[in-house]
Amino acid sequence: MSPRSALTRLVAAALTLLLGACTDIPTSGPVTEVTVSAEGRGVQIAPEPPQKGMSASRIVEGFLQAMADPTSDYEVARQYLSSSVRGQWAPRRATVVYDGWVEAAGDGLELRGTTRGTVDAVGRFTVSRESLTHDFGLVQEAGEWRVSAPPEGVLLSSYIFARSYDSARSYFIARSGQAVVPEPLHLPASEITPGRIVEAQLAGPGTFLSSGVRNAIPAGTRLGAAGAVVDSSGVVTVALEGVPQGLGDVERRELGAQLLWSLSSIPKVSGLHLVVDGRPYPLPGQNDKQVLELSSQQDYQPLSKAGSADLYGVHEGRAGKLSADTSFIPLTSDGASAEMTAISLDGAFTATVAGSPATVRIGPSGGAPVQVDTGLIRAGSVHFAQGRLWLLGRGSSGEQRLLSVSPQGEVAAIDLSALPGEVMDFSLDASGTRAAVLLGIGGATRFGAASLIEGNRIVGWQEVPLTASQEKELSDAVALDWTGEVNVAVVASAGSGKSVFVVAVDGSEVTDLGPVSASPVQVTALPRPGGDAVAVRAADGTVLLYEQHGTWQQAKTPMTWISYPG
């Protein structure tokens, strides 16, 4: 029997296999895969080896499912391959995530569809929207169908990827100061292990992040034979080799912080015991058991400084905040006018912006502010990051300008010349390293990210195409703000009407928080691990606050500007 005579089956039939019931699908044409949301993450995919007498289509289905299981170097998946390629296949080269189907093509079976992204050998996801065609090269060996043309790496449907892979983070030290900056990783759930995390650390940051961070682990360092293991108390012992002698306190402190924060991606990890060349390695701040505790490293985590979750804003020309019942409470009684306001993440500093050219009043919350004449006209975006105020507007000649202002009133201009378009909205993360940006390019608004280097230059722009459910690309974005370490809230369209989406900065996930009744022109979020404090403002001043159960509550008080701390 030829593969052509086999019934073509949907790639998503992996779900059917999991449930133990296979339904025949006609070969007269492709069947579009139904995109399933990632909310079902955590379903265990347990592929089975090929059985005697399996049809060609069942062999392809089984192989596509088995590629989700890396156990014993993809032992099950290799059993679906012909003997000539079984040992040559390199599944760890990369993972291609796709939406597609399997259909008959000539005398064989082909996978056809569109890629959604690629995960490299380290675990970094890159969005990729390309046409995909793969012929499995079905052959018979001893009367059984086998795949003779496996892919370069692994092919996973979006459905299987969402359920068999999990997320982790590899942290590096911000060039801008004492802070760790995460690089998202996507790994098979069974490989979220201390050893795999340390390997990602040794590989260093990817191209995008590298301009804004540095690796505290010296070049040439290797994972030792003892590897990395976690005990029942949550302490990870990491054995390294090749660490240079004579590292100073600051270098060893950063090495420990970077490693430990990365290992904290694993649930219940609480500490690090480092061994170098077979001997315990002293890390500044470790306890008498030579364990560096995660609780002692909070200063490296910018989000740990989050204070109040109050929503601030401007109502009738005055800065204030909303009470529990969303009534307005002015911040001061001096009657100072304000058009925009911002509060630092820890609540220590407050700023207001008013006038054109814009005047900034900035200083300790509740204290006497200093007044700064910025010279900006049409100021349109303001927020705090790393203890400084960031203000976007235009100069006297109409050119776009981005300024940072210290609480002492010192002003620095930021070089935007490396960006390939005009900034429509801008938000710097809590570490002061990564900028989420909406750029106007060729008449369209593009979402992407860039890095702040040397405190005064935005470089390394990388567009991140965003796709919501049902394969709808986000468009007409108007505003954004960071909701956490790796997620950004974006107001955009996915069809008709505006909605608020929480998107991963690498484009790997897009979550729709639901449409809003008003037409929003601004979004603000409190950057914290939960990422659940989001609010939007409409042009008429209507303010909507996101509720955790998925609805939007309208505030009693209309405002002309809104801002969560940070």
Question: Model-predicted segments: where are they?
Answer:
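Bimodal "functional hotspot" detector
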Residues: S2-R4, T8-L10, T16, G20-G566
